[in-house]
Amino acid sequence: MSQITMRQMIEAGVHFGHQTRFWNPKMAQYIFGARNKIHIVNLEKTLPMFQEAQEAVRRLVANKGTVLFVGTKRQARDIIREEATRAGMPFVDHRWLGGMLTNYKTVKQSIKRLEEKTAALENAAESGFSKKEILEMQRDVEKLERSLGGIKNMKGLPDAIFVIDTGYQKGTLVEAEKLGIPVIAVVDTNNSPDGVKYVIPGNDDSAKAIRLYCRGIADAVLEGKNQALQETVAAAQETAAE
């Protein structure tokens, strides 16, 4: 698992919070002080809390669990998609659709529709559709892919959710709480840590900081998968030896 250091966090600007006038008092315990009216996050707290979150992810994935990566703000989208894909985990990078988890049955129907439309599009020319019809089909598929592409291979509800910016993803937190799904989240000084099981206090606006968080969580996923694979191989060898 990648060992994120204090130096890397400083270089990525993890310690820069929001303007002091926008602060959330619930984050007081994670704030070191203020500089030029900007709150400074206490990295002495962030680093071990991030490591704890990584360890929780590793354990969960080693037990065949699924972590849903969520980050729909502009700075996070590409990074969330890239790192979740690298880790082989589902993600939401475009827009959180209301009921994405609490109404998962309906979402599954939409995913089925996406699969059917994608298959139809692949055979559209042979099936005699006009260029205009094919273009309309492409638009439909692209629209569905943007909203659901990241979760189309998800087999059921996730076992945990990793969130960038709790203020931006309030809908995600509400649904997770309703379903009892634990949340691992980056929480900046202007947001509340309520409803987050594993709080990572830090900058949620800097692309460098977002990359650092996502890479660290994705690495934890990959380590968990590797552990699960090793345990499966060891069990198979044990059975074969009997």
UniProtKB/Swiss-Prot annotation:
HAMAP family: Ribosomal_uS2_B (MF_00291_B). One of its GO terms (biological process) is translation. SUPFAM superfamilies: Ribosomal protein S2 (SSF52313). Keywords: Ribonucleoprotein, Ribosomal protein. InterPro entries: Ribosomal_uS2, Ribosomal_uS2_bac/mit/plastid, Ribosomal_uS2_CS, Ribosomal_uS2_flav_dom_sf. This is Small ribosomal subunit protein uS2. Belongs to the universal ribosomal protein uS2 family. One of its GO terms (cellular component) is cytosolic small ribosomal subunit. The lineage of its organism: Bacteria, Pseudomonadati, Pseudomonadota, Betaproteobacteria, Neisseriales. Pfam families: Ribosomal_S2 (PF00318). One of its GO terms (molecular function) is structural constituent of ribosome. Coiled coil: none annotated.
